[in-house]
């Protein structure tokens, strides 16, 4: 039904952004448009698309009209210039697990901070940036935050869909994020990152980025382990050398021209 609805759109070009299309689904669209473009698609339907642009997921073999690799990352360019050099101390941590926190990683993060070994220094600021969520979960987070603040003289801001998201992100000394587009928005700004996966394909992304020395994986595979996570947070907070190492590598990996490249590809179709 969805494919039928899309096929009725009056357009020469259709751009799809779906993780895993099927050949049958894409075949309903093939021929209904002059050009069928699929982005970050690792499904069987990608073979049906006229053009594939995969900036995040690189599992497809290279072929004509396939643009694969980080050089085609389509990222928000706001506040790139605000990122300062790495501070000697971590004063500001930004935490974001995407618009939909499937695994409730925010709860895992907050409960981890209750660990007695967690090094939360005085006057540390934490921005917990969340998407759409129910009131029950929000109230549980507020209770966890209250318990954390009872033991630590820090500040935790719980912000739902903040309008200044990228501004806050750009000012982070350390970020804890999931493995979707959020991790690329973060490391492209040269911010040291601890990554936690929402899904198995995100784990694959995070492992690949860790191998390139631009992030640290905060989980044991898909397993969330508080002790392991807190030890890593402590290491990142106390080691300027580690943060600078990740930051320098991320700046080398991303040239911030991915959005321009993608727009040029799409513009050439007109």
Report the location of each language-model feature.
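Acidic donor-binding loop of glycosyltransferase active sites
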Residues: 170-181
């Amino acid at each position: 039904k969805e494919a039928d609805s899309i096929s009725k759109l009056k357009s020469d070009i259709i751009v799809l952004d779906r993780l895993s299309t099927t050949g049958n689904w894409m075949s309903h669209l093939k021929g209904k448009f002059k050009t069928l473009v699929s982005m970050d698609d690792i499904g069987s339907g990608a073979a049906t698309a006229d053009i594939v642009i995969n900036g995040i997921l690189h599992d497809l073999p290279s072929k004509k009209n396939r643009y694969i690799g980080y050089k085609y990352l389509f990222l928000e360019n706001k506040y790139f210039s605000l990122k300062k050099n790495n501070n000697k101390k971590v004063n500001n941590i930004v935490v974001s697990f995407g618009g939909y926190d499937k695994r409730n990683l925010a709860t895992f993060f907050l409960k981890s901070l209750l660990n007695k070994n967690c090094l939360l220094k005085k006057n540390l600021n934490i921005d917990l940036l969340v998407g759409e969520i129910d009131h029950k979960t929000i109230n549980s987070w507020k209770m966890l935050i209250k318990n954390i603040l009872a033991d630590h003289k820090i500040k935790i801001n719980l912000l739902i869909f903040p309008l200044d998201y990228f501004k806050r992100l750009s000012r982070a000394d350390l970020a804890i994020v999931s493995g979707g587009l959020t991790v690329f928005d973060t490391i492209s700004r040269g911010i040291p990152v601890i990554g936690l996966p929402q899904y198995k394909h995100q784990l694959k992304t995070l492992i690949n980025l860790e191998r390139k020395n631009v992030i640290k994986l905060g989980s044991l595979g898909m397993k969330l382990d508080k002790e392991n996570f807190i030890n890593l947070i402590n290491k990142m907070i106390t080691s300027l050398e580690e943060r600078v190492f990740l930051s320098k590598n991320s700046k080398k990996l991303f040239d911030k021209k991915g959005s321009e490249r993608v727009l040029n590809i799409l513009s050439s179709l007109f």
